[in-house]
């Protein structure tokens, strides 16, 4: 999120090349330059997980189960794709070669185009 903030909230595909595909040296420089901002987001994640754990414990102790859908894909604009491009089917500029979706069925006569990049299983 810190690097996204530096790039005015734009998707990583619209960032300058040095940010889109940073060298290890540039990553180290970013980590040092934006240590305070990175720490802020780490703290927010800590708060969320702490509160989520407390909520789950509270609900479970009262016989309430919190259930949810497990995502099968990640967002194209996620840190996961940005940091691990080799794990996804992307072209040399980072754009997806294909995206996830489903064909027409009884839920949708036209099918659904989800837009998530596909995993590179090889």
Give residue spans per PLM region.
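Hydrophobic faces of well-ordered beta-strands that scaffold small-molecule active sites
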Residues: 66-68
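Flexible, glycine/threonine-enriched loop-and-boundary segments that flank and lead into catalytic domains
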Residues: 50-61
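Alpha-amylase-like alpha-glycosidases and glucanotransferases acting on alpha-linked glucans and related
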Residues: 1-49, 74-122
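Anionic group-transfer/hydrolysis microenvironments
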Residues: 71
């Amino acid at each position: 999120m810190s690097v996204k903030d530096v790039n005015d909230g734009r998707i990583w595909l619209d960032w300058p090349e040095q940010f889109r595909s940073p060298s290890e040296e540039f990553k180290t420089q970013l980590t040092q330059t934006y240590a305070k901002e990175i720490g802020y987001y780490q703290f927010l994640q800590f708060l969320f997980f702490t509160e989520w754990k407390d909520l789950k414990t509270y609900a479970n102790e009262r016989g309430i189960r919190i259930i949810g859908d497990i995502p099968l894909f990640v967002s194209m604009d996620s840190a996961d794709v940005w940091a691990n491009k080799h794990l996804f089917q992307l072209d040399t500029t980072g754009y997806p070669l294909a995206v996830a979706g489903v064909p027409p069925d009884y839920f949708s006569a036209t099918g659904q185009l989800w837009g998530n990049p596909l995993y590179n299983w090889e």
